[in-house]
Amino acid sequence: GIGRRQRQMCIRDSSKTDIYGYVSQLCDSLERNYKEYRIRMHETNFTSFKSQNRTDLSDYAQEQLRNIENGTEKLMKFACYEGRKYFKVVQNDFRNGEYRDASVHAFINKETGEVFKPAGYNKPARGVRYDLTNESHRNFLFQSKNVDWAGGYLYIR
């Protein structure tokens, strides 16, 4: 497995392989999806709480929306770590004043571009979910409406 000391964070750099660039684009798509999710959630809460005369909660939802809009809200991020065989996409949450690794979102084979759901922190589940070398798969995955930050799109249907 990739230990904390041995792993190397992937720098988002276009000089790396195409597959690395695709992983970076997937991370961007997941971050957009999470931002869109949070906006929808706070807009719904604002409307609901306002109709219930819960100004404390509707004010909170409105404040959260303002923070997202002006870029000060510490939204979830997705980082890419490079291992021997896989790129590991890891969810990063903002806690105690800094972003920290939370859970593994996906594994991507560095050679083939095959995308796997995680079986645990250090290994992928069996069964390829998507292939980043396939243009139609990329077109699907790079649209934030098609992926979800919680990983539901990685389940076999």
Task: Please report, for each region that a protein language model flagged, where it lies by residue.
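Single conserved hydrophobic/aromatic residue that forms the stacking wall/gate
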Residues: 1-11
